[in-house]
């Protein structure tokens, strides 16, 4: 018997029921009309159990299967359909109507059991439905909607409605009240108007009418003041009275309200035509041409001022003026007084009404041969080129012809008093008429050079120097009053001026180091109470650095006077060593032969640091005559060749220590430094102590260096120091940090190991180059060397120290497994592992070098095994199933990652569930990413907010889902998509994914109802094996996640449908595969998903004006109307008018009117404005093969032998047109034509006769037209063979 789908009636059973229903009335009717018959043969129930007796017409019976009658008792309730069910005849099945259930449909389904009604509504269970009785303020089928009582706008007069649950509240506009703001409030009810004012009610206010009360204000509260309206004019003062007022006027004003401005100019007080100005006129104050200074004031408005004509002055213009009294003539001009004026007689070189103009004599360009003119008073100076001289550069200089200057010098020609000569401009370090004197000399440290110079010159020092020392005095100049010094301080230049032993000014150029061994030119000079320091250097702006400052020199002398007329100078000092040249003191050159002692001529020296003498990374310092090596610790010695020996503490586990007894205590500022190398995280490094207590203690704790002083907080140095590398440790302490240090210094531990335990126990490792304030505390005796090295400090005692930094033998016993080779790496070891093994001790086997995975899968190492990782393609097939029953249940599964691409809008990516309490899933819902985690502990779980990001686009997407706090029992879960920096938090809390591993692990399903590709899928960092190992590959020690038995292998590789084979793109469009979708790159002129639509670029009306024209390649062109231009005819173009904006160059005429005027260019010109000159033959005017030749700016045609004329337009041999009447030419021409026609007819007859005679033979000559070329015959065709002749 076929099984019916649950909830669907059996068709055969339904048919039986219908037959019963139709035949039952008929049988009843027959039963009532047919007469009773004798008892049936079946009355004795002769048939066997399970069968039914049927009487026959002959009075017998037959036994057959029993008819079903299980529904006869109507066992189904509530209108359910009863259908008999076999094989039991009494069997039946009830098909319930909606709303009921149970074997007999006796149970009414309570639709209210799921509590569908919200907000406290009452649920009423009905047949196959429910009904929610909503509380006040809610509506909807499930009372999910809150009723907005404000929707009907119940609040009047602009009131704001605040919706509540089942109610509303009106916030009324000012001036209204009531539950619905329907009441206009009467603000006059409180009688706000005082002093009998009348109140008028307004909306949200009132107005007091104070007329007739004598008061004013909002409430008629202020008495009216008559002066408040400022009735007095011209800033007069108003005196308040009882119902009246009085104005006090300023002088010059009158009237009851001071409204009258008295006219002081009415009597014409100004003489000689002077202009009278009233002081009461405000327009005469302020501005550029104001008659009165300052601002207008009524206090000074009385009176007048006379503006006198030229030549007069005084209060009333009664005094005549002497114009020369003010000395108006400038620059020594003589003033001559004139009536109402003056005249200046100017000296030479000046001009102008007041001789204020300096006559520029250079305006006449007096300088010749390119000379530059500089104007002077009543003259000029010409700066001539090198080969010219004289006042006007008119004389060619010949003085350097045959000069005897040396090659390094420059000859400068001179022309003076009509005589040609020259001078030699010497290079640095030389002097003399022919640069024969050497000015270069060397200065040694401690041997300064003394010199005397004549007094009276400008106070200054100038020289060139070179040195490698950073400090020292270059030169000093002294006399009875002032002293000037030029020195190097920290390798930079400094100048100091003293006056009577008092420092007046110090100038510095701090930005350039000058101890580089190169020559540098410097100068310091005092001029016009300003001291200026100059340095010529490439690093300066414009190659010159300047520092200057004002100087105020003392007037009294206190220094010991030197001999009259002599100043002294000193070159060098106790520290400076180098070379000087071109030294000038107060402008006087100091030559080496005049200096006396300590002078070494020339500047010869060897660079001290080449080749580099310092080893072990030491830095070489060139000290001019010798060198110094600044050694990197722990190296020492003149060339850093020696190393301060290190000491190994605790070698072999034996406690070690060293103690020092200081001869004297360190100063208030203490610096402790040493080199440290260790792999131990704890141990005592150094401790100051006295006989009773410990002072400063430096020790290792948890790999960090700590320094402790009693009574002060500990100092912890950042970072870890126990990495086995050598580190320089330097600690500095101030006077307020250290009190009583003690004279004993314990290093590496105390004599008794137990005494070191509070600070981590005895130290194990290496210490080297221990210093206190730069002084050594050596663990072993140091060899004697030069005094530049740090000195030793204190006595020494040591126990179990090993010289050098010696490592423990970490390879004994051998820690490497599987044949690894052990190498000692200072208190550590390194195992070189053979193939297929890795790890610190080669204990971890590598599986992937054996290539256990077949392409396209790749092998990925996992703990105790490997996984074949690959991309896989799924096509709505069965999902890939995996199990983590072999995975360690102790491993934390705090997240998963998955890569996929699909265009499905509904699909499962990953799904696993352990009952209803634990599970994880990722899916695509409506084209967006969805997911969630249920982690037990009675929590509802965490769900990704919807809608999630869109992912059904065919592109690869990478999802990472992880716990925010993996170590916690429950945590938020975070999701990263495609490497986003900010994750999305799932709503809710859940625990980890431990239910996916261990013996009770659940099945993990991938790609269920999914079409697309999966990439790497990992749980807790362990990938799932989408690909299987190659046959015969050795399995790993543990298979963490395995394929579920019976799961078919997926299709490896990501392969989309062949959407571009054949290409769906029309009209030569290029198909682009987008994974289960395609896109067409259409050619010009086509568009649409398949390039099926012809592009009309003019359809969108791109042209703002004019007409749009389509090109065959799909482009459009806007053809603009007059007055507009641009690609889309948007730009207004001014009309072209010959008299307005069209200018034709070189005399070419402008033709045409607005808007299209243009230029008609003359011969030889071209361009829009005839601005381009053309070559005469550029247009080639010659005809009939003539050659154009340009001659004198015009073209000339050279014709061949058959033509002539200006343009070769006339053919030679043809009669020229004659100046005869037309008839005299036409008649002879007609006769000639008739004669030619007759001759042609005769020739044709003869040719026909000749052709007939040649029939039956082939003669190529017969195919030719007599007297003509072969290709000119347009009637007869040449046979192919004839073309070869």
Curated annotation (Swiss-Prot):
UniProt key word Membrane: yes
Lineage of source species: Eukaryota, Metazoa, Chordata, Craniata, Vertebrata
Protein known as: Protein crumbs homolog 2
Disulfide bonds: 71-82, 76-94, 96-105, 112-123, 117-132, 134-143, 150-161, 155-170, 172-181, 188-199, 193-208, 210-220, 227-238, 232-247, 249-258, 265-276, 270-306, 308-317, 324-335, 329-344, 346-355, 362-373, 367-382, 384-393, 400-411, 405-424, 426-435, 579-603, 609-620, 614-629, 631-640, 766-805, 811-822, 816-831, 833-842, 1013-1054, 1060-1071, 1065-1080, 1082-1091, 1098-1108, 1103-1118, 1120-1129, 1138-1150, 1144-1159, 1161-1170, 1177-1188, 1182-1197, 1199-1208
Assembly, per entry: Associates with the gamma-secretase complex via interaction (via the transmembrane domain) with PSEN1/PS1. Interacts (via intracellular domain) with EPB41L5. Interacts with PALS1.
Disease listed for this protein: Focal segmental glomerulosclerosis 9: A renal pathology defined by the presence of segmental sclerosis in glomeruli and resulting in proteinuria, reduced glomerular filtration rate and progressive decline in renal function. Renal insufficiency often progresses to end-stage renal disease, a highly morbid state requiring either dialysis therapy or kidney transplantation. Retinitis pigmentosa: A retinal dystrophy belonging to the group of pigmentary retinopathies. Retinitis pigmentosa is characterized by retinal pigment deposits visible on fundus examination and primary loss of rod photoreceptor cells followed by secondary loss of cone photoreceptors. Patients typically have night vision blindness and loss of midperipheral visual field. As their condition progresses, they lose their far peripheral visual field and eventually central vision as well. Retinitis pigmentosa can be inherited as an autosomal dominant, autosomal recessive or X-linked condition.
Recorded consequence of changing residue 1249 to G: In RP; uncertain significance; reduces protein stability and expression
Transferase listed as a keyword: no
A cellular component term, taken from the record's GO annotations: apical plasma membrane
PTM per Swiss-Prot/TrEMBL: O-glucosylated by POGLUT1 at Ser-267; consists of an O-glucose trisaccharide, in which the O-glucose is elongated by the addition of two xylose residues. O-glucosylation is required for localization at the plasma membrane. N-glycosylated.
Domain Laminin G-like: 431-603, 647-805, 871-1054
